[in-house]
Amino acid sequence: MTLKFEPTQLRAYFVCGTQDVPGQDLNMVVQTALDAGVTAFQYRDKGNSQLTTVERFALGQQLRERCAQAHVPFIVDDDVELALALQADGIHVGQKDDWVTQVIQRVANQMFVGLSCSTLAEVQIANQLEGIAYLGSGPIFPTTSKADADPVVGLTGLRQLVMTASCPVVAIGGITVAQLPAIAATGAAGAAVISMLTRSPDMAATVKAMLTATEGH
């Protein structure tokens, strides 16, 4: 049974793949994050990942089950076939991936769809589409986690995107704990992070800071 999308799922959104935690067991990293209280998990295994297609699917099955047990949405990045095979709760696509309308048609009524938007023009186009649950906007700050990241948006740019968007926006890119209140003040529904959690010495405290920042917004 897939979970329906709720804006509160964006409050503490964890994005991760094997390439982000070299030498570590991604299963254990994700379980620690789930125990800490993350509100969504995106399986983004790409870039420097060494996994084969079969290995990526097998690991995805394990992660999907962990998320299901925690009642946290399991979201697959980019890969429609993988998302369908794993019966994911959601799929996140970028502007350069399969055109989002095709993705929406493929996964209709099976999972929710998130779309990366980093410019006002992209948000305005997304507003015209049926079937977009949320937008991922950024990078808000410079990031080292994505080699193909778009130009930095900044807090002012994020506020404009949030005001323009007709669905919830989650901020992504180069975010630190200290910046969480300022991000929440823009009206963003939450933050999507990779290294802020994978490199955290205390993941529970970091997730708590993410949740605290979005209280009352």
UniProtKB/Swiss-Prot annotation:
UniProt binding sites for 2-[(2R,5Z)-2-carboxy-4-methylthiazol-5(2H)-ylidene]ethyl phosphate: 143-145, 174, 194-195
Cofactor: Mg(2+)
Annotated binding of 4-amino-2-methyl-5-(diphosphooxymethyl)pyrimidine, by residue: 42-46, 77, 116, 146
Keyword Metal-binding applies: yes
Cofactor note: Binds 1 Mg(2+) ion per subunit.
Reaction(s) this enzyme catalyzes, per UniProt: 2-[(2R,5Z)-2-carboxy-4-methylthiazol-5(2H)-ylidene]ethyl phosphate + 4-amino-2-methyl-5-(diphosphooxymethyl)pyrimidine + 2 H(+) = thiamine phosphate + CO2 + diphosphate; 2-(2-carboxy-4-methylthiazol-5-yl)ethyl phosphate + 4-amino-2-methyl-5-(diphosphooxymethyl)pyrimidine + 2 H(+) = thiamine phosphate + CO2 + diphosphate; 4-methyl-5-(2-phosphooxyethyl)-thiazole + 4-amino-2-methyl-5-(diphosphooxymethyl)pyrimidine + H(+) = thiamine phosphate + diphosphate
EC code: 2.5.1.3
One of the GO biological process terms: thiamine diphosphate biosynthetic process
GO cellular component: cytoplasm
Residue positions binding Mg(2+): 78, 97
Top enzyme category: transferase
InterPro entries: Aldolase_TIM, ThiamineP_synth_sf, ThiamineP_synth_TenI, TMP_synthase
Its job: Condenses 4-methyl-5-(beta-hydroxyethyl)thiazole monophosphate (THZ-P) and 2-methyl-4-amino-5-hydroxymethyl pyrimidine pyrophosphate (HMP-PP) to form thiamine monophosphate (TMP).
Stated family: Belongs to the thiamine-phosphate synthase family.
Protein name: Thiamine-phosphate synthase
Protein source organism: Lactiplantibacillus plantarum (strain ATCC BAA-793 / NCIMB 8826 / WCFS1) (Lactobacillus plantarum)
